[in-house]
Amino acid sequence: MSILSTGAEAAAPTPEARVQAFIADFYKLHAASASIRKDMDFDKWHAAITRLESAHFVAGARSGLDGVMAGNPDHAPGAENIIRNVSQGQDVLIETSLADGSLHHYFEYELRKVGGDWRIASLRTYLDPIDKPFMTEAERARFEHPRLVPLRALPKREAALDGTAMFVNGRLAQVGGESSAIEVRRVGTLKVNTGILVAGDLGYDSKLLAPLGQRIAPGQYPVEVSIAFKRVAALRMKISDRPVVRWHPADMSERNHVVGVDAADVFISDISALLPVTIRHKEKEFEKFANAGDLTSAIMLNLAGPDDAVVATSGYGDGAYPVYWGVDADGKPAVLLVDMLVLTELSDDE
């Protein structure tokens, strides 16, 4: 029977047998659907992948392969080899490696026994060995000993910033002739162990993260988001209850106060949350956020421990987003704010 047809798949007596059967069937599907992929017929490709998943995955689980049509097959018998098998309670994790020219791809299959059959519960793809530290040795140095950066005045075009007004629940915001009521949502409480905060995009590697140039006292701080125009408009961490009297750019140790975003997220944590984390654990935590699939998503993550990081959807997606310190009358940080550039009436002087 063609892999493009619907049919009953034989039960797999072992986790390894299921993985090997899936690899072989995907490879056959990839070859048999060359014309579908050439024509970029997404509907037919999606239908074929759905049938493949039905044959090998637990009910409702997805492979993520329906979005991958071009290039060499992601899985190929003989080229993709099992490198580790780990029991995890009732489930089994199988890790594989596939060489594609000069590149290596690593896969993690989570398998679950359903009756007498082993099925794939999840499939994750990595570009580096799965247990490799998220932060390289070279990267660790700039995070462990970051440079302190004095506070400076806001740039002229940002002088109109009103970060406090961004968090007035029910306030009617006006942008471009449209209006939206602001909704303030509590995300959680961020645990800060060292007082060295990191901001950026968690979706890729640590190069998109940077330590901030100011320090705060270790402690636990409430985190909120402002929702407007059906998206996250701002993210803030309240360091104290004292009123903010001035705003300053939250410059980073080796760059300005703007975080570059390529995965549509803004992330904040203490440095202690990142140093011990492996690529596998970082990806699993970030997956919780990615699976929400909501323009208003903001959740706490558990990297090195409970609630030691926060991640939120970044305004209108990829781009560059400014970070600010709100200081009290004594010049001490009272708020850390990320402006998602949605409420431009409150952030842009032009």
Give residue ranges: language-model regions.
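N-terminus-biased targeting/localization segments
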Residues: 3-4, 108, 119-122
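N-terminal domain-onset segments
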Residues: 4, 12-16, 20, 137-350
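Core segments of small alpha/beta cavity-forming domains
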Residues: 7, 11-68
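Low-complexity, intrinsically disordered terminal/linker segments enriched in charged
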Residues: 15-19, 23, 27, 86-91, ...
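Surface-exposed, charged secondary-structure patches
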Residues: 47-105
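Short aromatic-glycine motifs in intrinsically disordered, low-complexity regions
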Residues: 67-70, 109-114, 312-315
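A short, structured loop/turn motif at beta-sheet edges
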Residues: 84-91, 111-117, 327-332
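Short, surface-exposed coil-to-beta transition loops
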Residues: 102-108, 318-323
